[in-house]
C-alpha cells in the first residue's frame, strides 16, 4: 500500500455510479470472493445488496483513477452518516460500506489516510481518504470496459438543500420542488444530447478542468436550509473556466457567444433601491493605486464590491479578498487603506449602495439570479436548444444571441420587475443582416481549426446519439 501524501487532493465519494457491464460485475465478484465474507448475513435484507455496494465503490475508485491516479475519494467512516432512506442516496448505500472499505484496505487494494477530527467546525477536520492501490490500479489497467460503460443511478437527486455547514438536508417534496426537478431533468437531457467541446483542445482538459460529457450534469443547490437562499445551478465544466476559454467553446460544432448581465448583483441592489445604474459601476476616472493599470484597478474594484456584498463584515471582506488572490498578484498585498480608497471611489459613483455592503446579501441575491436562470433554461429546453449558464451569464450558439438577450430581459423583468442590462463581446448572427459583407468575415473569423482529438470526440458523440451533428453554415 502506498502513502497518501496529500489527502486534500480529493473529492467526495460519488454513490451514484453504476454499470451492468459483465466485466464490471466480474471484477467485483473477483474482489468479493477473494477478500470479503459471504453476504449471507442475519438481520433484515438490505435495500441494496452488499455486492452491489462494493460495485459502486469500485466504480468510483476506477473513475477517480482514470481522472488522476493521485486523486483521493473522501468517505465517512461513521455509521450514522449512511442513511439508506435519504433522498440523496438513490442506491441506498448503507453502513455496510465501512467494513467493505476496511476489508479492501486490509487486502492491500486501497491506499487509505484516516480521517481527522479536532473538534466541531475545526478547519483541519476531514473524512477518511481512499484511492486504488498499485495492486488495484494494475487490475484496472487490464480491464476492457471503458468510461462510457459507467453510468449514473436512476433517481439521483438534482434539487439539493444544504444547511449552514453545507450538510445535506432532507425535505418533503412540494409542487415547487417537483416542478424544479422535472425542468432540470429536461435541461440535463438537452445538454446530454448536445456536443459541447473546445475545438483547439487535442486532449479534453484545461489545467485541472476535464472538458467532457461526464462533467456536464447540472444540479440546483439551495443553502442554509432555506429555499429563499442560493438556488443557483451548478455542475457544468464551463463554469470552471475563465471567460477567455469559455469564448472558445463550440456547441454542436458551432461557435458560441456569451451574454452577461452587467454588474448583476449591483444592478439588483440598485433596482431594489429605485436607482438606475449609469454606465459601468466599477469604472472610476482616476488611478487610485500607483503603478496599477486602469483595467486591473477596475477588476480589483469589482472583486472588492462583490466580496463586500457577500461578506458579513468589512474585516472579513478585506481578508477574504486578499486570500482569494495567488501569491504574486497585486491584490494579495493590498492594505486596508488601499481597499478603503477603492471602496470610497465606488461608493462615490453609487452612494445608494453604501448601506447594502457587508450585510451578507449575496446568498439572497443568488436566489434571484437562480430564478432568472430557471426562466432561461425553461425557454430553451422547450425548444431542445442547449444554453450554458454561468450564474450571471449564458452561452449559446451564435445564431441565437438576439433571442437569448430577449429571454434574459423577459426573465429578469418577471423575477425583478425590470429588464436588467446585458452585454456581449461578440455579436449574434440573428442580430445583424446575414447578407452584409462583414458578417461573412465574422463567420470566417469565428471558425476555429479543429484538433484531431476534437474530431475524434465529435465522431464518438455522433456514434453515441445515432445521428450527425449539423453545425451552422452561412448560405
Model regions and ranges:
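C-terminal polymerase-core module
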Residues: 312-317, 401-475
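Catalytic palm active-site di-aspartate
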Residues: 260-261, 386-398
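Acidic, glycine-rich two-metal-ion catalytic cores of nucleic acid-processing enzymes
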Residues: 124-297, 393
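A short, conserved structural fragment
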Residues: 101-119, 384-388
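Adenine-nucleotide phosphate-binding core of ATP-dependent small-molecule kinases
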Residues: 355-372
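Short alpha-helical segments that sit at the start of domains
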Residues: 2-73, 363-364
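Helical catalytic core of nucleic-acid polymerases
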Residues: 37-44, 48-52, 63, 73-94, ...
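Active-site palm subdomain of RNA-directed nucleic acid polymerases
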Residues: 371-390
Amino acid at each position: 500500500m502506498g502513502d497518501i501524501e496529500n489527502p486534500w487532493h480529493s473529492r467526495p465519494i460519488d454513490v451514484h455510479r453504476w454499470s451492468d457491464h459483465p466485466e464490471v460485475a466480474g471484477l467485483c465478484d473477483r474482489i468479493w470472493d477473494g477478500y470479503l465474507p459471504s453476504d449471507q448475513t442475519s438481520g433484515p435484507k438490505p435495500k441494496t445488496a452488499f455486492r452491489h455496494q462494493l460495485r459502486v465503490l469500485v466504480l468510483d475508485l476506477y473513475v477517480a483513477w482514470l481522472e488522476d491516479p493521485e486523486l483521493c475519494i473522501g468517505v465517512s467512516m461513521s455509521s450514522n452518516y449512511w442513511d439508506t432512506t435519504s433522498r440523496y442516496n438513490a442506491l441506498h448505500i448503507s453502513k455496510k460500506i465501512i467494513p467493505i472499505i476496511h476489508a479492501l484496505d486490509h487486502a492491500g487494494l486501497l491506499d487509505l489516510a484516516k480521517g481527522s477530527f479536532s473538534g466541531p467546525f475545526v478547519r483541519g477536520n476531514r473524512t477518511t481518504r481512499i484511492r486504488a492501490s498499485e495492486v488495484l490500479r494494475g487490475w484496472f489497467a487490464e480491464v476492457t470496459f471503458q468510461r462510457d460503460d459507467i453510468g449514473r443511478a436512476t433517481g439521483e437527486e438534482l434539487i439539493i438543500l444544504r444547511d449552514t455547514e453545507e450538510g445535506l438536508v432532507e425535505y418533503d417534496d412540494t409542487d415547487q420542488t417537483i416542478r424544479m426537478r422535472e425542468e432540470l431533468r429536461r435541461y440535463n437531457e438537452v445538454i446530454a444530447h448536445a456536443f459541447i467541446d473546445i475545438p483547439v483542445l487535442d486532449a479534453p482538459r484545461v489545467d485541472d478542468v476535464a472538458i467532457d460529457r461526464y462533467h456536464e450534469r447540472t444540479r440546483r443547490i439551495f443553502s442554509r436550509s432555506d429555499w429563499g437562499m442560493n438556488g443557483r445551478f451548478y455542475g457544468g465544466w464551463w463554469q470552471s473556466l475563465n471567460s477567455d476559454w469559455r469564448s472558445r467553446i463550440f456547441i454542436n460544432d458551432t461557435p458560441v457567444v456569451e451574454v452577461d448581465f452587467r454588474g448583476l448583483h449591483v444592478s439588483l441592489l440598485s433596482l431594489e433601491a429605485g436607482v438606475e445604474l449609469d454606465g459601468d459601476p466599477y469604472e472610476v476616472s482616476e488611478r487610485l493605486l500607483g503603478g496599477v493599470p486602469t483595467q486591473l484597478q477596475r477588476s480589483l474594484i469589482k472583486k472588492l464590491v462583490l466580496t463586500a456584498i457577500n461578506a458579513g463584515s468589512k474585516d472579513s471582506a478585506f481578508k477574504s479578498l486578499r486570500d482569494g488572490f495567488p501569491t504574486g498578484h497585486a491584490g494579495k498585498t493590498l492594505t486596508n487603506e488601499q481597499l478603503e480608497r477603492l471602496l470610497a471611489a465606488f461608493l462615490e459613483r453609487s452612494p445608494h449602495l453604501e448601506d447594502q455592503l457587508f450585510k451578507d446579501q449575496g446568498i439572497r441575491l443568488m436566489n434571484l439570479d437562480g430564478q432568472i436562470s430557471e426562466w432561461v433554461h425553461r425557454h430553451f429546453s422547450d425548444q431542445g436548444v442547449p444554453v450554458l449558464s454561468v450564474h450571471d451569464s449564458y452561452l449559446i450558439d451564435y445564431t441565437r444571441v438576439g433571442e437569448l438577450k430577449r429571454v434574459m430581459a423577459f426573465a429578469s423583468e418577471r423575477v425583478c420587475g425590470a429588464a436588467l442590462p446585458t452585454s456581449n463581446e461578440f455579436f449574434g448572427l440573428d442580430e445583424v443582416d446575414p447578407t452584409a459583407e462583414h458578417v461573412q468575415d465574422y463567420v470566417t473569423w469565428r471558425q476555429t481549426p479543429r484538433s484531431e482529438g476534437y474530431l475524434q470526440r465529435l465522431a464518438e458523440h455522433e456514434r453515441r446519439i445515432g445521428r450527425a451533428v449539423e453545425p451552422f453554415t452561412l448560405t
